């Protein structure tokens, strides 16, 4: 290691921090609008946008307000959105998830009518929790457990339906074993071999998802999701989940929540060269907004 014991006063690191221009020039990491993905909620059967109480400034959108919101975002330099749909009809199998006239499919078509893929990347969440009457991310057995392999069939059908509607990218979030392999095979068989998959590889069970479940109206009717989402104490498991997603065909891997698992992001960067998405989740957002509203921090 280099000996810096006699570096001062010749070496003064504050020289490169003295003004905003210098700090920007030597920033090791830069986040721009085109690095971000905007999560948007679109709800069937409402006539005007509805603000989500636990997420100030975030709305359940109509198709019309969705398009207008995205127009504003694109004008600001944003290049990508991810869609979460809330249907009017929910049932045990989440039948509206793969319906060609489902709310997500309608939203995709509405956005593709306004924006080309060169202007906007439309990503669709591929899961069942927003669509099932019980709020779990899959098909339940008679014992109330999520049936992994039956659920995979529904994921494939939903992913193909979303791609058919015009989605540019599929994002399976349910944490079922083998979901990337199943969806990749299903998309390829349907002729969508060029559609990338963003895998929720290290998705930890977390109380920080609470406001999202308000927004997507998908809180579990009973139990929790700990049998399929990851245990917060596990890092080696995150490596294994990510490795499996990569060999199954993932194009992007993800860590969720992001802020509490920066060590996991760093760990995954050492093991793979794929893009890593960091999901800043609803609870993280809501904590900032709540602290800002109370004057404890600058919430902006």
Regions found by a protein language model. Name each.
Residues 2-7, 11, 19, 31-37, ...:
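Alpha/beta enzyme core
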